[in-house]
Amino acid sequence: MITTQTLPTLQPSDTSWVILAGGQASRMGGQDKGLIQLNGQPLVQHVIDKLAPQTPTLLINANRNQSQYQQFAPVISDEFPDYPGPLGGIHAGLSHAPTDWVGFVPCDSPLICDDLVARFCQAVKPESDILVAHDGEHQQPVFTLFHKRVLPKLSAFLARGDRKIILLYDECHTSYVDFSDAPSCFFNLNTPQELAQFGALHP
């Protein structure tokens, strides 16, 4: 009789999660988006409130106002001086997080669902390098879970000047996590108008 051995499901406690707050926020007039107030709290605090019950290890990727972010969680910064978008934060997270699996979310999504980490963990396969959320219509490339074995490939990718996150996903064993029943999880706030509207709709 041949038996197949299944790998145990990755546990949320065996993951670290990084909140990406290192962008330039040009559509927010250059303001540091994670520190913008929403209903009396900085945006990054809303994200922490959603993630903290799901995972024991949280980090913040920030490239300015690090001392302010340090009040919320340990801060890591990009190693690349040209700030290569979210891949710079992902590179920093993979370099500094204590676990083999490292997840990433943006700092401007206050409606992250309560089982986001569990869904990612349950979707991990033996061959997985990267997992990316999918809302049923589109992939959500900055809601993602990476294994640290991707770090050398990511370093080479950035060193040759590539900056498009989706191109990296095409080069790795990437699979997608179904969030078609929870598309609001990925709602993000990009402009002052969206921020004001969201605050009014969600007092």
Curated annotation (Swiss-Prot):
Pfam name, any one: NTP_transf_3
GO-annotated cellular components: cytoplasm
Subcellular location: Cytoplasm
An individual GO BP term: bis(molybdopterin guanine dinucleotide)molybdenum biosynthetic process
EC number: 2.7.7.77
Cofactor(s) listed in the protein's UniProt record: Mg(2+)
InterPro entries per the UniProt record, alphabetical: MobA-like_NTP_Trfase, Molybde_CF_guanTrfase, Nucleotide-diphossugar_trans
Binding, GTP: L20, A21, G22, K33, N61, D78, D108
Cysteine disulfide links: none
Top EC class of this enzyme: transferase
Catalytic activity: Mo-molybdopterin + GTP + H(+) = Mo-molybdopterin guanine dinucleotide + diphosphate
Swiss-Prot/TrEMBL keywords: Cytoplasm, GTP-binding, Magnesium, Metal-binding, Molybdenum cofactor biosynthesis, Nucleotide-binding, Transferase
Domain of life of the native organism: Bacteria
Binding site for Mg(2+): D108
An MF annotation (GO) of this entry: metal ion binding
Alphabetized HAMAP family for the sequence: MobA
NCBIfam families tied to this protein: molyb_mobA (TIGR02665)
Its job: Transfers a GMP moiety from GTP to Mo-molybdopterin (Mo-MPT) cofactor (Moco or molybdenum cofactor) to form Mo-molybdopterin guanine dinucleotide (Mo-MGD) cofactor.
Comment block on domains: The N-terminal domain determines nucleotide recognition and specific binding, while the C-terminal domain determines the specific binding to the target protein.
Subunit note: Monomer.
Homology family: Belongs to the MobA family.
Full protein name: Molybdenum cofactor guanylyltransferase
Organism: Vibrio cholerae serotype O1 (strain ATCC 39315 / El Tor Inaba N16961)
Gene: mobA
